[in-house]
Each structure stands twice: as C-alpha cells, then as structure tokens.
C-alpha cells in the first residue's frame, strides 16, 4: 500500500482525486494539504464528503512528505506547483503535477503563462503524462506533468493520424468545448449559473495556454518543422465533459473505414480509448465520470478534410483519472487499476 | 461468485444495475434479458457501454434462469414483473423487483395502478426492500419488492420521527422533486428537453402511485389508525437526483438539535444514511451517483412544524443501488459491498 | 411621455426593467444610475445591450432627479433603498422600491433583515404593490413597495382562498422553488454553475425574510388573529422561474371545480392571472419572460387539503414586470401597457 | 392591417411566429392552420398561450386563403411546403416558407433531402430570405425561402469576408452548435432530456442538408468556381441559441481591427447585426429571444486564419424573426417593425 498526499486540496482536481483514490486498491490517501484552508475539515466545503473526512487538512511540510509519503499529487494553481515539485527532485517521491507548470519549454511557458518558468533541471526530469502515447517515458520518470484537458482530447485524436501521415501538419483546426467545471471552483461571472446556463461562450480565442502545449507534443511526432494549430475554446452549459472537434487536411486519399482501423490498431493496447464505428461519433455523456476517451472520425471527401471528434470527462481523463493512470504505469500496475468503472449514464 | 440476470435490460434501472454490478466483488452479471430487443447488442443503444458488452441480449427462459442463475433483477414495467416473479416462487432464486408490482396490497394496487394485482401467495412471500428499516425481513426473504424512489426518500425521513412520536400521523405534507430520469427512458413531451429544461413541472398531483406506498409502510410504524399523507411531485430540470421536502406537525416541544440526535441514533448502524448538522440541509448533488440518503431537519417553532429534507440519487438509492444493497443483506454480505464509492461531484 | 430613472443599474432587476421599459409606449428611460459603476457603459457588463446603450451610467443626484424625472425605480439592495425613497417623500416623483426595505413593519424589518428600518413617515405613505389585490391603494400612492418574488406567487394563490374562507389560516405550508437568477448577479458558491447545476438546494429554511412579508399581507385578509405560514425555499437549476406549491387545510367541503371557479371569479378583471383548468397545473416555463402568474389547484379529499400551485417569472411578475404594472395603475393607464407580450416558449 | 395565416401551426417555428406576430403593429394573425390537429385549441398543447387562443386551429383550404389572407407563413415540414407554396404562385399572397423546400437547386435538393424537388417555376420566383444580403431581391418577390438556422449564422459571418477577398473560398470550416429546440418539437432520443442534458452530441457530420445551402449562397459572392465548406453540427444542452465558430484561411495580411471595421461598414444599415469589438466574442445568450445576429472576429496571425464567431437565436433570426423581417422588407416597412425588442437576459 503506497501512501499518497494531495497538495491543493480544495479545488475540483483534488476533489476528483479523492473520489478516485477512494477505490484504488494499492494507494492510501494519507494527507490532504491546503495552504489556505489547513485546519479545516474538507466536508465543511464539500458536504458530499460527509462521513468520509476524518481529519482536518494539513499545512505543507516538504520534509515530512519526503519521509512519510510515496506519491504526491499537485493540484495547486500554475505558478505554485513548480516550486513544490522542485523540492522532490532528489527524493524518491513520485510526483504528478496537474497544473500547467511543467508542460512547456521555458520560453513558451513565459510567453503563454506570463510567469517565471520552472528550472531546466526540473523540466528535464519531467515526463509528459499523456499515458497512451508516452508510457515508456512515464515508466522511467519520477515527475510527471499531467496534460491539460484540451490537449488530452486533441492529442489522442491527432497523434495517430499525424504519425501515419494521414493528415497534413498545417491547417489543423481544433474547436474545443468544455463544461463549466473546467473553469474551476472559483466564483466569477464566467462560472455564474445565470450567465453560463442556456449559453455557449467562446473564450481565450487565440490566447489559450493549451495551444503551445498541443503544438509541442504534436511536433514531436513529425520529422520536419513544427506543427501549428488553431484552437478555440467554448464554455458549454454542463458541469463535466469536454469535446474537441478537429479538422485537418488529408495528406492522402483514404476512406473513413480505413481511418477507423488505423485508430483501432494504434490504440489496441489502450484500455481507455474507444473508437466509434463508422457513422457514429462520441458524445461527452458517453464518458462522464470515467477515464475513457472516445474517438470518432469522418473523411469528408467533398472537402478533403478529416473530421475527428474526441470526448473525455475533463475532470477524469482530463485531470485526476489520467494522473492515477500515470501512477499506475509508473508503479508497474495495470493502467486500469482503480479506474475500471463504467461511465455514469444518464 | 453468484450469477445474476437482469430482466428488462434496456431501461435506466437496468443500465444503472449494470454500472453498479460491474464493480461488485461477489456478483457476476451473466445475462441481460430483453423481450423487445433480444439479439441486439446493448451498446448500440448505449454507446457508453462500448467495449463492455460482449454478447447480445437474450430472450426470457424461466426454466433456464432457474437452473443457471442465482439472482434476478426485474427491471421491467409494472404489470410484467409480477408474472415473472411468480415463476420463481418455488425456486431458490433471489428475486428483486424494481417495479411497483409487489409494493401494495391487492386492493390498493388495483386502485392506484389500475391493473390486476399479484397473487396473495406472491405478496405474502415478498419483503419490502427499504433496507435500513426492514432488514430483518429482507434477510429471510427470497423475493424483494424494491421501494419506489419517492417512498425511499420520504420513508427514511419520516419513519424515525413517527416511531419516536415526534410528529403527528396526520397532516404530513411531502413535496417531491425529481430529475427527469425518473420519468424513464421513453421519449415523450414529459421528457423532451425543450419542454422540461428551464422549467419546474408539477405532475400527478393527488394521483401518484407512490402515495399508497408511503402510507402503507408509515402505517406499519404507528399503532392506531392508518397514516395519510399529501404528496406532490415535480419534474426538475436535472437528470438525476430526488428530494422530498416534508412538513409534519410536531407532537411535542423539541429542538432541532434533539431531532438531529434522534436521527443519528436511529441510523447509527446504517452506512448510507448521513444526517446533516443543525442549520445545514442536503442538496441532491451531494449524493449523485452514490447510494447515500442525506437528511436534514429544522424545527419551526413559529408554526410548530418539523421540516425534513431528504435527498437521494433516484437511480441509485431510489432504484439500482438499493436493489444491490438488499441482495447484500440477503446474502449476509456487508451492505456496502460494491456500493462504497463516493458521490460524483461536481 | 413620462421620464424614468433606474437607480442601481447593474443588477438583474435593473436589466429586466430596461428590457421591459424599452417597449413601454408612455415611459422614456432617461437615466440609469449606478453608484458603483457610474461613468461606465452598461453594455460593457451586459453585451446583450450592445447598440442599445448610448450614454454612461450616472451618479445619484437626488435634487436633479426631482427636477427632471417623473418615475424612479429603486433596484438597489435592501438597506440602501429606504434612504433614497425617503428623499422623494415631499416630491411628486412616483417611486417604486424593488427591495425589501418598505415591505415590513419596523419591528419585523429589524428582526428579519437585521438592519435599521425605514421611518414610520415613509412606511405610512407606502403602498404594497401586489397589483391585483391592492390596486385601490396603489392608485393613490406615490411610493410603492414592490413585493418579493415568493410573496407575489404565494399571496396571489392564497389570498382568494383565505378571503373566501376556503382554507384555514393555520397550517399553511409553502414550498418555494426558484431559478438561480433569484440569487442575484453576484458570484458566490450559491450561484456557481458547477455547484447549482444538476442540483436542488434548500436554503434559508425557517429564516427567509419573505416569511413575515407573506404573513403580514395574508393577515390583512382574515379578521381574527395573525396568519402564520411555513415557507421553505429551494434553488432549482434554471435561470428564471419561480413556483410556490402550497398546502392548506380546507375549512369546508368543496370540489376542485368550485375552487377553480372561485379563482376565476376573483381574478376576473386581472389580465395577468391565468387559472388552469381542473387536472392541469402551471409550469414555470409557461410564464417565462412574461408578467403572467398562472395558478392551478387540487382538492385532496383524502387528506382534506387544498393544494395550490402558482408560477411566475421571478424577474418579471416577481420584480420588474410588476413594478411597471404598478406604475401603469398609478398613472391610470391600462395595467397591461408595455407588458402585453406572450411568454417566450420553449 | 394585413391578414396572416400560419400553416403548420403546432411546431416551434409556428409558436415563435405567434409570439412575434402578437406585437406586430401591421399584421393580424387571422388563421392558424394544422392538418393534423385542426379543430383543437392550440393552448391544449401549449398552455403558455392560455387566454391568447380564442378559436380552434383550422383545416387547409387554399382558395379560402387566397381570398381572405395577405401573408402566409409555411411552418410545415420539408416536402409539404413546396406543394402549398406552388398554389400561391399566381395569387397575390406573400408566402414565406420556413422549411428547406425552396432553398436549393433541384438536383441538390434531391441529393440532400432525398425528396422530389419543387418545380422550376416555383424555384425561379423564389427569393432567398437572408434579409441583410438579399433585400433587393426580397423586395420584389412574393415567395421567400427563409434560410436555415446554421446558414443564417454562417452566411452572415462569411459573406462580407468573401466579398472583400479577405478569406480564401477553399478550406472554410464551420463548427455549428445549436440548442435542442433546433431538433424540433417531436420527442425522440435526440431530444430526450436525460440523453441530451450534460452532453455535447455531434450529429449529421458530413451529411447535414445545410451544407449545400451555405455553399450555394456563398458561391454567388465569388466569381470563380464554387465554394466548398466543411460543416459539423453539435447539439448543446440548452433550449435556444445557435453559434457558428468559423475558420477560414486569410487571403491577405490584415489585422483584427480592420476586419472588425469591414464588418461594421458592411452592416452599417443593418439593424440586427451587432459587431463585437476587438477581443470580445458573442455568446448565444446575448441574443436570446431577439432577432439579433452578433458577430466577433479574430485574426490568428500564428496560423494565418480568420476565426469568426456568429451567434443567433435559432428560433428568431434563425426562423420566425427573420421571416417577419422579410415580410417587413417586402411590404416596405422598417425591417425592425415588430422585432425591436431587447434580448431576454439572463
């Protein structure tokens, strides 16, 4: 039984980690750490955890963690995580950072996050936790940068097609749609029910920090120059769920059926990727509460475009679920351990 | 490992049973039976079950079930269930009926359901599956009538107060609020998104078949005459969740704190009942996806009324979850077996 | 053409007044006043008003208002309104206060709002703006206290029954359900989408400031002692809409049909009250965006209770619409002036 | 006062026409015709129309209409409309067809609708009712083919850019998002609340009948060859509202500010088009219940793409509102007549 701690215990990422870890057979959640609310009981904020919570949230003590804990999940905001992660560099702690701090090169991080980047030493030791694609690196790493929610859905849909030279590396459009929980727990106009309900709201057009993240990891899969993508993101009036509808120019004449076969082959060993059959496309509700990423595809012969639809639960495969999946891989456990439940439907 | 079958495999009750049984350690779901869709794969209707489903739904063969199966869940409509349940009377099958067929006396059933009632022989052998209250009878029964969703929330809130003579048995008002999944999977004006979204819709006022069910089981807890309740039900624009807000005249001068203590004491041994502390009330979201029933109370001294708020997930504690809880009790397993997960929040 | 000003221009009450006044034939909205945001353009906060807004919001200058303006709508928070309203006491300004400041007696206000009450001089000159019931007083008043949203729905349903001695004045239960816009424009956990969506949340049980308001105006309609009601309120995952489901002990043996006839007779002259026929009940969506209050009733012979269901749009009949209806009555215009549009459906 | 009739009186298009015509100063709605429900009162299906409806729906009698009526709105399904419209060819009736029957060339109609097309005589006399762009033709026509909901939003965003050679005519991607009312009044899995709530559902990918409609009217604005677009459509869990997020390769180096100026200039005379300022994008809620189309734009210099976001209420500008706007133009009235109300917000 490994001992885990969550740092940043009061956001939605942490709350979902708590739910998922509760049924993990090899991990015991030993500490929930919150700098802003230590001393408080978590179920005062989250009554759905009534009877679950037995001890108050704790302050952060790095040395104590290094001594007592095996696994640390960083569910802190960008900017905070990189400092904490650096403290574990020389320890044996397995650290999963759910923020964006360790996802980009220093220069890109500075430009898109407008914060000071993590040290090169830290970035070099960090593996990007898109489990299905980077699991060899994940197995050997102690520090994982857990992917952003849009990048998870986008990369899982695009990488197999780019690797197989099905689509061009230029002219890829990603239309992202996310539930409001993606905007976090803080109250603002952006998360106000009366503002967001019965509404579709585009946001951060052209400026979303997930753009360079998607481009960085796509570029690792084509030889030549760097890939550029266009990403728009939209708030959808639902709590959970994220979809990327993607458009990419075809490099070759291919049928939908063959594209689907390619996907199936690519993800043959991946328990959490489900490919829809021809003529069917995933809905976000098909994956709610689960770690699945469902993918559908359509070759538009009229316009020579491949249309890809990729759906995840932003809090599971897009955050806490993938974090646990990475921990499973790092520890040599089956990637499904503690994650093999069906979606909650309807 | 016990073998289970679900009969009526395509409604929401069945779908939730499938989700929950999938993580039950002692039950294997061996057969999904559907008279209307046998031969089909369930994931054609429900793509969220993709990769889970490996064999088509089957026709109903009673004798085969008796030979091969240990546990049968009846997720069929009222009217159908009682015929099937009767076939198992002399077998060793443990049968849980999720319909209303076995919940009322013959005369009440005829009046409120306007169908021919089950045989007296069947009714006599049936235990009412409100697990927390009737577990002694459930342990000894082979046939369980699983409670309706409103009765579950209402009875769990009212019974401790009636038993302890806190409230009068006359003048109880129950204001029921349910998510649209309570109206089932069939498409109609009542379940149409454009009709029900951004809407509160009262329905079946004074005529809901859950009225006699609540009255029957409340009456078993007061000596004198029969209890009468007023129940209204409202469709709420959400998928899951059910709340009963209840009003009952106080029999004695008592404080909120004492009422809360009484509840805590009454449900001391019950894993799934959580009592809110003074000044707090449950939201339906606090129990989503879980088998919990959360209860809050307030003594309104100004009007001498007890106000009780009781929240469940209508598809879990109000249907499939309680069915499995009953099976656990019938088999001597911990009632939490396969049901000990946290709510999905947010 | 009368000139109007709105004070407190950035809340939902003001925004709805702007929408409704825009099509009023006899009122010109001359000023929008905001102490916190004067100098700003309202469409920066509310882009749906783009092209409508031509001048910035202004500071409050009482004397200037008295000289230039005929009608003032106070859409300010409780506590602020009573100070401003007092300034108009000796002027010819018609002032409608949408806050709770002028609704209660001094002692009740102090107890339930926990603020210093308005002066007796102001309270004496104020008429309560439940248009259908108090129009004679409204015609003669210059200062109107516009009713709260729950009291509007509750009183319109209860008063005809109390006046006609159909129901008892004791044992009335009001189960209130409101859309999230009722919680206002400010961001908080209570208005957060992820918290409130897919959820029913009871709040302020036993402590809602609308309780004494309902009781005060009900009591004016029965000779004997004062009426006491039990009110609970619930947040429903919708933006607009409010329903009171009410339960009251019958004083006499009467049929549903006769109750409905009584309502129809009582509201014969009232353009905005629509009585549902026997067996039908209003949904909140039936009145969305309109000034209607729809009422349905059912005599529960089994329990000797009258069940009343009353639905309004909380921002229209529950706030801005009724405010304009009152202005119409005060000026001798048809009460429908500027308000005679159909509900927005679906 | 012109007399109008609606044929197909029970769908959402008709219901919205009734709401809007009710406040039109020059049009009297004289007849509501329904082949399937004639003899019934419309408020039996739609209680929000209680007190509005005074006469039952009628059967269709073409000759009677020609004699008594000036304006006919066809709110019938595709396939039915073209037969009725043909009957008015030699009459003086102004006919607006809200279905897709008259929008495409015969060959395209046959291919995409898989029905027999309208006669050439009828198609030749029909003007396409995208009011802002085709008003000269609309003024001279008696028969109008009212645009589809997605084409309205897409064309209003794309045409000014194509006409001004800002974007290429190849490689245009349109990501469409619509509220569930776009799927109509009929109950099906696609409109079931429990299926569609908390969900984003792609549908008709590559096969939507709005694809050839968009292409046909875009092609009329570029000299050379025909334009091809990629369109995907998604059901969003909201009742009303439609957004097209569009991506098009830039033909020239241009700044966002200049693009916005071009839009403003193009729509200078158009009362219902509102262009967002730089850095802001429309939400569907900004136009709910109104005839506005709000447009925002962003030049993505990184990828040399123009991103356009265009939002309408699918039932107003996307159907009934635009139909009335066309009637206004045909009769020489101000296009805003009866449509100049503000959006319903929040």
From Swiss-Prot, chains A, B, C, D:
It is found in: Cytoplasm. Gene3D superfamilies: Dihydrodipicolinate Reductase, domain 2, NAD(P)-binding Rossmann-like Domain. Its EC number is 1.2.1.38. The active site is at residue 149. GO terms for molecular function: N-acetyl-gamma-glutamyl-phosphate reductase activity; NAD binding; NADP+ binding. Signal peptide: none annotated. Keywords: Amino-acid biosynthesis, Arginine biosynthesis, Cytoplasm, NADP, Oxidoreductase. PROSITE patterns: ARGC. Pfam families: Semialdhyde_dh, Semialdhyde_dhC_1. InterPro entries: AGPR_AS, AGPR_type-1, NAD(P)-bd_dom_sf, NAGSA_dehydrogenase, Semialdehyde_DH_NAD-bd. Belongs to the NAGSA dehydrogenase family. Type 1 subfamily. This is N-acetyl-gamma-glutamyl-phosphate reductase. It comes from Oceanobacillus iheyensis (strain DSM 14371 / CIP 107618 / JCM 11309 / KCTC 3954 / HTE831).
């Amino acid at each position: 039984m490994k001992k885990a701690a969550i740092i940043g215990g009061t956001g939605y990422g942490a709350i979902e980690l708590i739910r998922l870890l509760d049924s993990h057979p090899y991990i015991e959640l030993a500490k929930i750490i919150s700098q802003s609310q230590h001393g408080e009981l978590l179920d005062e904020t989250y009554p759905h955890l009534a009877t679950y919570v037995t001890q108050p949230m704790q302050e952060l003590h790095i040395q104590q963690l290094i001594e007592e804990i095996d696994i640390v999940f960083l569910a802190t905001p960008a900017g905070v995580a990189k400092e904490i992660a650096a403290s574990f560099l020389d320890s044996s702690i397995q650290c999963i950072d759910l923020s964006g701090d360790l996802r980009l090169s220093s220069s890109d991080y500075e430009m898109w996050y407008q914060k000071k980047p993590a040290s090169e030493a830290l970035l070099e030791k960090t593996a990007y936790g898109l489990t299905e694609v980077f699991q060899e690196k994940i197995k050997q790493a102690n520090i994982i940068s857990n992917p952003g929610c849009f990048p998870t859905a986008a990369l899982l849909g695009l990488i197999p097609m780019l690797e197989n030279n099905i689509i061009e590396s230029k002219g890829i459009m990603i239309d992202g749609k996310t539930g409001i929980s993606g905007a976090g727990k803080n109250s603002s106009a952006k998360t106000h029910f009366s503002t967001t309900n019965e509404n579709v709201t585009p946001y951060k057009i052209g400026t979303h920090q997930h753009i360079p993240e998607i481009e960085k990891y796509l570029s690792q899969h084509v030889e030549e120059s760097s890939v550029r993508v266009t990403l728009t993101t939209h708030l959808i009036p639902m709590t959970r769920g994220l979809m990327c509808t993607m458009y990419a120019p075809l490099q070759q004449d291919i049928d939908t059926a063959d594209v689907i076969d390619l996907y199936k082959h690519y993800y043959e060993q991946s328990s959490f990727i489900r490919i829809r059959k021809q003529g069917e496309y995933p809905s976000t509700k098909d994956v709610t509460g689960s770690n699945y990423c469902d993918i559908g595809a359509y070759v538009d012969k009229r316009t020579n475009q491949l249309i890809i639809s990729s759906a995840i639960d932003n809090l599971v495969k897009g955050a806490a679920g993938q974090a646990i999946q990475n921990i499973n891989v790092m520890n040599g456990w089956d990637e499904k351990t503690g994650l093999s439940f069906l979606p909650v439907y309807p």
